[in-house]
Amino acid sequence: MKLLQFKAVWCNPCKMQTKEFEEIPVDIELVPIDVDEDEEGLTTQYSVRSMPTMILVGDKDEVINRWTGFTKSSTINEFIQEYSNKQ
């Protein structure tokens, strides 16, 4: 699994969100994506319209869950734990 973090340098909630990611489990790949420099088009592909947006994707890039706006790492961690236990 990987966690896509859509952000922008001018976005204050994005800066706070980045600090929250220090608490994300190490087995989750964190992929920061600056929406203003997104050459791969992931912002459009995942229909991101506000920042920060975090999207948890599986091994085949399927969307597992998405969070929009500042989200506590504990909320994301709880979801990841519950999802992993079901697999």
Predicted regions and their residues:
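Local sequence-structure signature of Cys/Sec-based thiol-disulfide redox active-site neighborhoods
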Residues: M1-I24
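Structural micro-motif
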Residues: Y46-I55
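Chalcogenol-based redox active-site neighborhoods
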Residues: K19, I24, Q45-Y46, S73
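Thiol-based oxidoreductase modules, predominantly thioredoxin-like and allied folds used
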Residues: F6, V26-E40
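Structured loop/turn residues at beta-strand edges in well-structured enzyme cores
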Residues: V26, R49, E62
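CheY-like receiver
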Residues: L42-Q45, F79
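Non-catalytic, surface beta->alpha helical segment in thiol-disulfide oxidoreductase systems
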Residues: I55-Q87
